[in-house]
């Protein structure tokens, strides 16, 4: 594929013109619009920009970081500048993770189309690369960076500089011996294939070679039977057949003669270990593998809080981009805070704050466009409506007209249900969650439990009022005043709420006696955590028949997150996260929903679906079978530099392993650090964990740069469910702080899970 990329770079007209470069206007806001010169580098993998045509250039973005290309009409920012900048000449580069979009405006429609076609072609090529092709391209990229004078050759001085860039601290004499061995032309420089040989010598994996030789009779190859023994004994793939082992050899053995003889060379063995089949995440858990025919309340549902915000809760920007990003990452419940807007059009923003405002109809149109691009399973619009009767009618009209048949406006088949429908039954449908009028209610309604700005303070006041009740007269006046200020619920909007009627939570007993399966309560994180401690088993039982939504405390004005695991432990289905904020909590959320096709629905364990369940997340007892996990952290590969501006700095990496689950299972351990080696550090240390409830456990592997003077710096992480972990020798491919792949950066581990014998407490 790397060669296909090189072919395209020399033949495709769009790519040839992009390599010449051209001026475009870079747009950050209505007031920031600067002319920059953009050029595709010769490697076809990076785009650089400069302030002037012949000025000093710097990297703008890597093709591997690009998710998609959108035309100007789809850009919220460019649309707001349509009178000043022609939309037809604009386009947007959308990146993976949480990186901001790049809005560009070319000098002509033709130039804009050329860049859009060219960039999309490159993105498609990179997306279809396998591990070896990505490695080849990665090497090509390093060669370009190391070849400072761009003459297509690398001197030893350039190689020394490159080693520092690659995080390698190496004895100069040893480095020179590798350089001379690779310089087969004896020219004093390394070219193309010579550099590849130098890299292979540099990255020789002694620990993998030793493993290979321990199963190979002659130390040169693995026969079909030897490879089958390895898969069954070490990789714990007990059901592996000769046919499956042969498929793996055919896929990963690079030589045709090896394939014909059904043997695996050292290169093929390493290729297998670095592939998805050798990954710690079980490939069987990547597609949709769970039963999707159970009621909605039997699933954890990927949920977003204040989806419209791309910044903080007080002054941040509101944007439809928040909905696009949430939906494209598999989020199935998005929040819409709706208020009266000018000209009779409802607006979405964080009420009573300085956050910017967007039109409700634009949000609905965005949901209609992106709802099912990543997952076919239902999307829930969680409406927080603060509008007048008239603007509620406008909301209902927009929902009906824009969503069309996607909107679920009646029960399935018109039949009165006895339980919530399943994700399978609701494929490609959009459900409205909100207040609903019933025959018993009048048109004035009590708002759902609010998401207050000062949750903890209000809780303190609540507890005070419990012991010091208001005088009855004052209380009645307060209620009358409150009643007058409440908006009136519009029947047209109410009628669109079918299965997800919002109700205030009073107690578990009250819910059991007065509420129905199609009603849903929202809890602040503080209240939910308190209920788990005080009545954990009741909360679990409540969540077996009714949906619960949990949202972050109003004190989190910086859009920080809580740990969703604590709420999942009680079976809470919709744990809403501030998805715009990267960090440990979002790593756990992303890792949890990476399974099951990334569809946004994960089936809860059976003990969280049984209405008679005795499970208490704070005090888990039998019949759970505890498991012991042994992790040998063996080595690391091509770990990135933390501070790329310091050319001479090299990381001192250590690996931290964290377990999140029920409180008794939460633990962390770490290795020692390896000094001055981010390229191929070796640890060889074993960590041991005992877990009581593996069905709820999440593992997070974090690589840190040790710093004796201050806090260790983050290098990369990977988080996954315990139940999706493969045993044996596995590679863990690291992700950045914002969730972007850091390939080829990885750590190599050995995983062994032992089930405790019944009654064994040792």
From Swiss-Prot:
Ca(2+) 2 binds at residues 183, 185, 187, 189, 194. GO terms for molecular function: calcium ion binding; G-protein alpha-subunit binding; phosphatidylinositol-4,5-bisphosphate phospholipase C activity. Pfam families: C2, EF-hand_5, EF-hand_like, PH, PI-PLC-X, PI-PLC-Y. Its EC number is 3.1.4.11. Ca(2+) 4 binds at residues 650, 652, 676. Residues 443-471 have a biased composition (Acidic residues). GO terms for cellular component: endoplasmic reticulum; nucleus; plasma membrane. Residues 443-483 are annotated as: Disordered. Ca(2+) 5 binds at residues 705-707. Ca(2+) 1 binds at residues 147, 149, 151, 153, 158. Ca(2+) 3 binds at residues 306, 335, 337, 384. Hydrolyzes the phosphatidylinositol 4,5-bisphosphate (PIP2) to generate 2 second messenger molecules diacylglycerol (DAG) and inositol 1,4,5-trisphosphate (IP3). DAG mediates the activation of protein kinase C (PKC), while IP3 releases Ca(2+) from intracellular stores. Required for acrosome reaction in sperm during fertilization, probably by acting as an important enzyme for intracellular Ca(2+) mobilization in the zona pellucida-induced acrosome reaction. May play a role in cell growth. Modulates the liver regeneration in cooperation with nuclear PKC. Interacts with GRIP1. Interacts (via GBA motif) with guanine nucleotide-binding protein G(i) alpha subunit GNAI3 (inactive GDP-bound form); low-affinity interaction. This is 1-phosphatidylinositol 4,5-bisphosphate phosphodiesterase delta-4. It comes from Pongo abelii (Sumatran orangutan).
